[in-house]
Regions:
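Outer-membrane beta-barrel translocator/channel fold
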Residues: 192-209, 236, 257-340, 344, ...
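Short loop/turn motifs that connect adjacent beta-strands in outer-membrane beta-barrel proteins
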Residues: 22-38, 80-90, 133, 188, ...
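Outer-membrane beta-barrel "beta-signal"
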Residues: 218, 351, 431-446
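Solvent-exposed loop/turn segments connecting transmembrane beta-strands
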Residues: 166-173, 199, 210-212, 235-245, ...
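Outer membrane beta-barrel
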Residues: 79-122, 126-204, 220-224, 228, ...
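Transmembrane beta-strand segments that form the barrel wall of outer-membrane beta-barrel proteins
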Residues: 152-166, 191-198, 218-220, 226-238, ...
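Residue-level signature of outer-membrane beta-barrel architecture
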Residues: 30-31, 44, 81-83, 144-147, ...
C-alpha cells in the first residue's frame, strides 16, 4: 500500500516537471467571478420497499414489514467559483441541501430521511430508531487552488471515485470532508490523491455520522485512444479496510454506427479487525478478504443496447461495502441494482436491454431499461453454500429536451427481488418489491 502511494506521488512530481506537454488550465483562467457557476436542483423523491418475507436478524422469526416508504422534497445547492488569475489560482465552493418530508413518513427508511433517537425493537434507546425529521439541512464549503493543470480542493465534497464514491441514489448526496488533488499534467492521464476525515451519509445530519477516522485514496486513469482506457484506484481506511480497483474498457466500432463495448472491472478488499462485515464465513476477523470481478459485453445499434455480464466473488467474506465509511456507492460493477449480487462466493449473470425512444423518432428524452440478474452459490455461514437470489429490474426516465423546463426529468424504477430461504436473514435484503420515483428540476443560477 505504501509503495502504491509513493508511486502516485512520484507520478505527480514527474508530471509537474513535464507539464508543457499540453496547455495549462490555469493559464486560461478567466477569473474568480467570470468562471463561476451555480445551480439548485429541486428534487422530489419517493422510495417504497414492501418486504414480503423479511426475517428479523435478532430473533430469527419472520416479521412482515410492509409499506416501508419515504417521501420528501429537497433543494440541493452547488456553487463553485472560478479561479483567480496568476501562476496559482484560488477559488471557493459551497455544496448543501435543505429538505422536508412530505406526509407522516412513519415507516421512513431506505437512507432517505434522518430519524431521531428512539427505542429499538428491544426497547433500547438507539440513534435512528425514533420519529423521522420534519425538516433538515446539511452541507459545507470548500476551498481550492490550481497550479498549471493540477487542482487541490479541501472541504466538503461529493466524491465519484470507484473506491470512495458518495451515495447519490437517494434524496440527497453523501458528503465527505477532506482534501483531493486532481492532476492532468500529462495528456490523457488523470492522477488523483486525497485524504478524507469525515463521512456524512445521505440520511445523516451529523457531519461525521459514519465516524470516519482517516481514508487515503490514490489512483490514475489513462485514455490510450478514443476507444480504450484503463484505470486503477486504491483506498486505505484506517482500522477498517484496504481496497484496490482496476478497470479496462474497450469500444469496438462496427458498421452502421454500431459498436461492441467490452469491460472488465474488479476489486480486492482486505478488512481490518475493526471493520464491520455481515457475510463472513471465517471466525478470524483479522483475516477477512474478498475478491470480486466482472466482465460485460454491450452491443449498441441505433436506439437499442443489449448487455450481458458475469460477476464473481471469492474469499471468506462478500463485498461488504458502504458500512465502513467507504462510500455508499463504491461499487462500479455491472450487476448492481436493488441487490448488488455481492454475497460470499456468489456468482451472478445478467442480461440487460435499453431502448432510446428518441432515436426511434417517437419521443426524444424517453429511455427504458430492463434487466434480469440471477445469483447462485452464495455461502451463508453455518447454513448453506448454495443460496440463490434474483432480480427483475425496470426503469423509465424522461428528460425534457427544450423550453423553460429543459433538463427536468422524471425517473420511475421498479425492482422485483426474491431470494432463497437461507438468504432471507435481516442482514440481507430479503424478498422485496421496490418502487423509486424521482422528479428532478435543475435551475441554473449563473
Amino acid at each position: 500500500m505504501l509503495n502504491a502511494q509513493k508511486l502516485t506521488l512520484a507520478v505527480l512530481i514527474s508530471a509537474a516537471i513535464i507539464s508543457s506537454a499540453q496547455a495549462s488550465e490555469q493559464s486560461e483562467a478567466k477569473g474568480f467571478v467570470e468562471d463561476a457557476n451555480g445551480s439548485i436542483l429541486f428534487r422530489t423523491g419517493y422510495i417504497s420497499r414492501d418486504k414480503t418475507n423479511y426475517v428479523e436478524n435478532l430473533t430469527g422469526k419472520p416479521v412482515q414489514v410492509k409499506d416501508t416508504s419515504s417521501f420528501a422534497q429537497t433543494a440541493i445547492v452547488n456553487i463553485d467559483s472560478g479561479f483567480t488569475q496568476g501562476i496559482v489560482g484560488f477559488g471557493v465552493g459551497v455544496v448543501g441541501d435543505g429538505s422536508f418530508k412530505i406526509g407522516a413518513n412513519k415507516n421512513a427508511g431506505n437512507n432517505m430521511i434522518p430519524r431521531e433517537t428512539g427505542l429499538n425493537n428491544e426497547g433500547v434507546p438507539t440513534k435512528g430508531a425514533g420519529d423521522s425529521y420534519d425538516h433538515w439541512a446539511r452541507g459545507g464549503a470548500n476551498v481550492k487552488a490550481r497550479f498549471s493543470n493540477t487542482t487541490v480542493r479541501y472541504g466538503t465534497q461529493v466524491l465519484d471515485l470507484p473506491v470512495l464514491a458518495s451515495n447519490t441514489a437517494r434524496l440527497v448526496p453523501e458528503y465527505f470532508t477532506g482534501t483531493l488533488l486532481t492532476s492532468h499534467e500529462i495528456k490523457n492521464l488523470e492522477v488523483i490523491a486525497g485524504k478524507f476525515t469525515k463521512d456524512q451519509y445521505s440520511d445523516q445530519v451529523n457531519t461525521d455520522g459514519r465516524h470516519l477516522d482517516r481514508a487515503i485514496v490514490w489512483g490514475a486513469k489513462y485514455k490510450f485512444d478514443d476507444n480504450l482506457n484503463a484505470s486503477y484506484y486504491g483506498l486505505d481506511s484506517k482500522d477498517k479496510l484496504e481496497r484496490h480497483y482496476v478497470n479496462v474498457n474497450y469500444k469496438q466500432p462496427l458498421a452502421n454506427d454500431s459498436s461492441l463495448t467490452y469491460d472488465f472491472s474488479g476489486y480486492h478488499t482486505k478488512f481490518d479487525e475493526g471493520a464491520f462485515t455481515y457475510s463472513q464465513t471465517t471466525d478470524d476477523l483479522s483475516n477477512r478478504k474478498n475478491n470480486i470481478w466482472a466482465i460485460s459485453t454491450a452491443y449498441n445499434t441505433g436506439p437499442h443496447n443489449v448487455m450481458v455480464a458475469y460477476q464473481q466473488n471469492s474469499g471468506n467474506v462478500g463485498y461488504d461495502y458502504g458500512e465502513n465509511a467507504d462510500g455508499g456507492q463504491s461499487i462500479y460493477l455491472p450487476n448492481s441494482y436493488l441487490s448488488d449480487f455481492i454475497g460470499n462466493d456468489e456468482k451472478s449473470a445478467q442480461i440487460q436491454y435499453s431502448l432510446d425512444f428518441g432515436k426511434l423518432g417517437v419521443l426524444p428524452g424517453l429511455n427504458w431499461t430492463t434487466a434480469f440478474v440471477y445469483g447462485w452459490d452464495i455461502k451463508v455461514k453455518n447454513v448453506t453454500d448454495s443460496a440463490q437470489e434474483r432480480e427483475f429490474f425496470n426503469q423509465v426516465k424522461y428528460t425534457v429536451q427544450s423550453g423553460f423546463a429543459k433538463d427536468a426529468s422524471l425517473r420511475i424504477r421498479n425492482s422485483y427481488y426474491r431470494a432463497s430461504d437461507a438468504y432471507q436473514n435481516g442482514n440481507y435484503i430479503g424478498d422485496t418489491n421496490e418502487w423509486r420515483i424521482f422528479l428532478d428540476i435543475p435551475v441554473k443560477l449563473f
